[in-house]
From Swiss-Prot:
GO terms for biological process: rRNA base methylation. Keywords: Methyltransferase, S-adenosyl-L-methionine, Transferase. S-adenosyl-L-methionine binds at residues 292, 321, 342, 390. One of its GO terms (molecular function) is rRNA (uridine-C5-)-methyltransferase activity. Residues 9-67 form the TRAM domain. It comes from Lactococcus lactis subsp. lactis (strain IL1403) (Streptococcus lactis). The keyword S-adenosyl-L-methionine applies. Its EC number is 2.1.1.-. Belongs to the class I-like SAM-binding methyltransferase superfamily. RNA M5U methyltransferase family. PANTHER family: RNA M5U METHYLTRANSFERASE, TRNA (URACIL(54)-C(5))-METHYLTRANSFERASE. This is Uncharacterized RNA methyltransferase YljE. Pfam families: TRAM, tRNA_U5-meth_tr. PROSITE patterns: SAM_MT_RNA_M5U, TRAM, TRMA_1, TRMA_2.
Amino acid sequence: MCYNMDMTNFKKNDIFEAEVLDLTHEGQGVVKIDSFPFFVDNALPGERIKMHVLKVGKSFGFGRVDEFISQSKHRVTQLNLDYLRTGIADFGHLSYDEQVKFKHKQVVDILRKTAGKSDYPVLPVVEAIKTINYRNKAQIPVQMVDGLLTTGFYRKNSHTLIPVEDFYIQHPEIDAVVLFLRDEFRKINLQAYDEKTRKGWLRNIVVRRAFHTGEMMITLVVTSKKLPEKVELVIDHLVERFTNIKSVQLNINSGTGSFILGKEFILLYGKDFITDLMLDKTYQISAPAFYQVNTPQAEKLYETAYEFAGLKPGDVVIDAYSGIGTIGISMADRVAKVYGMEVVPAAVENAKRNAQLNELENTHYEVGTAEKIMPKWLSEGIKPDVIFVDPPRKGLDEGFIKAAAMMNPRRIVYISCNPATFARDVVRFEADGYLLDKVQPVDLFPQTHHIELVASFNKK
């Protein structure tokens, strides 16, 4: 075997022996050849590998492991490598104890790098109760493979489907539903959508399973509302086999983009929602609604948020990015008034319905952006004691931070699914008079690189 020793001119298919030095935040091993970094899947710190160069850029390259010369004592060796190839479990080859250590270090390092301080109090990670089979929702792509309708997951950074039957991190009954539908659709020769020819009907199978009630919702993402022959019979067989299915819907997505759901839903069976519990409150969950995918860990997350808030019976609180109301409704019994806002009208209607379902009379929800709603509330004399915010991965707009500071709460509680944008927002909050008090990482996503956190900011 030939080794290219010209370290200044790497080429595709070169092979080097090297030590893995670190992990990226996405779980790739970091190898340096003459200070030039390569990122390598399925490689852990401390391992020595023969690395096959796949791609070389100006500042870094990518490689794969051709051979392990030595392996880490923290490696999980029995893992199905398809979980790494697809990203289903991009940390699945690392022992759970080490995953937790890495995620804590990730939060600390990002805060130090972005916010410029090394003394932020980052508490130990709240570990997961279950480290596999925990997800209550799955979005499964469907393609024709060798003439057969096939379910699985895309190879990372591609739309090439890798067939998967056991998805490892989602509830086993979700897997069972997906396989049942795959087999039934094969029997009737149903055609999956083909991105190249733009022909075929079925694009994705989306399954939710409520953690506490066991109710299930099936959404078939399709190109047309016209049902192919015998699909209704498949649905009949499905609900006979899985009696806890309470909703079956079509979602119409005739577009050519990579987004999963279209705007139109058509009910085929049952109700247009399922019901679950969160911290002893009842919630109706619609097909497009956001709902945390790991219910037991989400309950820990929210309890931590309420503890950080230091809630008092007379408090007025704002639940920004309120969604279907889970954060505000779950704490409504502990405070005097909950105000929530959300830009998605259907989510606001869900929040109002969920408040009624729980017989709450101290909640109020409006449609609109926080940047517009909060100044309006301030002009109406509403003065919150605590503001809760749970934004998407992009974090907060600067306008939100300004509007929140104008409300002058004693404390702001921030729930984040992206440490990088959270760290950026720490700097912005501190510029507007709110200092970071403490950070609590919570592992909602075992076997993956993702980490959730709760943080509190106190007014200077």
